[in-house]
């Protein structure tokens, strides 16, 4: 099956290229850029030499439709909202890595993203692509909104607790840390080497745009869920996310019960690895892979659960999950082309 990538020169775009070029079923028909049309992708990224021969093309929906069946949008917020109607109109299926179609309520998007929302009809039709929890919907979708990186790690961590109803609905606290690639390719003062090396930054306190998509899914799982407390930090690694999540249980429990809950929940999810009791993951242990590793602890004294989850923000947090969703969309085994062992050390 032929695919196209729009926004091919960003970090999400080049990770899609890496995965799709090695995929046994998908093949890249075309790569598209806004600012570097006519350039060979190998001139922009020399590490693709002797692997790719593509020239970056302008964006023409009708031309893309003649070459591809699925389009990946690795574009900034606001851009996908403009492009997607044109792509859908010519019969293409769209997997969008931006936040433009993640929220059903347009006012929620406008509040958190500070820009106009996409067409309301498309917001209602878009499927939120949290692969492990939306498989049937993804398989029948025309438009998939790939989840945010923080949202993916947080939702996989908290899903068993919320869906089982064992935690107090207003008790969820999420402490999130991300590698610098999560901030995108464009450099800023905060991502500048002298500012970040041997340092860390907290940013967007109580204002991160992934909050509403997390809360939207929590409410779908449990209507009684209340707003969460969510903080994000930038740490001096290139890839990786670590979520530390805290919640208070309604009734006294044992760690063995929680361990069993997580193991049973993700028993048939190939990319979610629940650590043995007392073990906790680190971001390096999933680097370059589509895995989400989870560890659980329980404090009987405070009756609080602590859940630690880690992902590679460029893989399970972006391109990897997008390809996982494309596999589901194409009727393939969802692990196809994604069975990479983590890069370690």
UniProtKB/Swiss-Prot annotation:
Annotated catalytic residues: 149
Entry keyword annotation includes Transferase: no
Domain of life: Bacteria
Subcellular location: Cytoplasm
GO cellular component: a single term: cytoplasm
EC number: 1.2.1.38
Keywords per UniProt: Amino-acid biosynthesis, Arginine biosynthesis, Cytoplasm, NADP, Oxidoreductase
The protein's annotated pathway: Amino-acid biosynthesis; L-arginine biosynthesis; N(2)-acetyl-L-ornithine from L-glutamate: step 3/4
Reactions mediated catalytically: N-acetyl-L-glutamate 5-semialdehyde + phosphate + NADP(+) = N-acetyl-L-glutamyl 5-phosphate + NADPH + H(+)
EC supergroup of this enzyme: oxidoreductase
GO molecular function, one term: NAD binding
CDD domains: AGPR_1_C, AGPR_1_N
Protein role: Catalyzes the NADPH-dependent reduction of N-acetyl-5-glutamyl phosphate to yield N-acetyl-L-glutamate 5-semialdehyde.
Record's protein name: N-acetyl-gamma-glutamyl-phosphate reductase
Organism: Bacillus mycoides (strain KBAB4) (Bacillus weihenstephanensis)
């Amino acid at each position: 099956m032929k695919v196209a990538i729009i926004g091919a020169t960003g970090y999400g775009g080049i990770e899609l290229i890496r995965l799709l070029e090695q995929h046994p079923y998908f093949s890249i028909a075309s790569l598209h850029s806004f600012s570097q049309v006519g350039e060979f992708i190998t001139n922009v990224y020399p590490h693709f030499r002797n692997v790719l021969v593509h020239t970056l093309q302008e964006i023409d929906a009708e031309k893309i439709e003649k070459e591809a069946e699925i389009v990946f949008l690795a574009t900034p917020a606001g851009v996908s909202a403009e492009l997607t109607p044109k792509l859908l109109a010519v019969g293409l299926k769209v997997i969008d890595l931006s936040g433009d179609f993640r929220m059903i309520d347009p006012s929620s998007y406008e509040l958190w993203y500070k820009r106009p929302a996409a067409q309301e009809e498309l917001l209602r039709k878009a499927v939120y692509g949290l692969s492990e929890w939306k498989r049937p919907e993804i398989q029948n979708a025309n438009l998939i909104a790939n989840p945010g990186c923080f949202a993916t790690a947080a939702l996989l961590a908290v899903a068993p607790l919320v869906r089982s109803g064992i935690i107090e609905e207003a008790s969820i606290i999420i402490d999130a840390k991300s590698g610098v690639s999560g901030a995108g390719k464009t450099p800023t003062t905060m991502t500048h080497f002298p500012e970040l090396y041997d340092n860390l930054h907290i940013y967007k306190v109580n204002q991160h745009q992934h909050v509403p998509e997390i809360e939207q899914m929590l409410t779908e799982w449990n209507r009684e869920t209340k707003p969460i407390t969510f903080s994000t930090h930038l740490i001096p690694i290139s890839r990786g996310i670590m979520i530390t999540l805290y919640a208070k249980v309604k009734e006294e429990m044992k760690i063995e019960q929680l361990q069993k809950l997580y193991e049973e929940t993700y028993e048939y999810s190939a990319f979610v690895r629940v650590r043995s009791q007392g073990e906790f993951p680190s971001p390096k242990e999933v680097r370059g892979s589509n895995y989400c590793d989870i560890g659980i602890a329980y404090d009987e004294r405070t009756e609080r659960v602590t859940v630690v989850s880690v992902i590679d923000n460029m893989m399970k947090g972006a391109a990897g999950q997008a390809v996982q969703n494309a596999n589901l969309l194409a009727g393939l085994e969802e692990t196809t082309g994604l069975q990479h062992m983590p890069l370690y050390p």
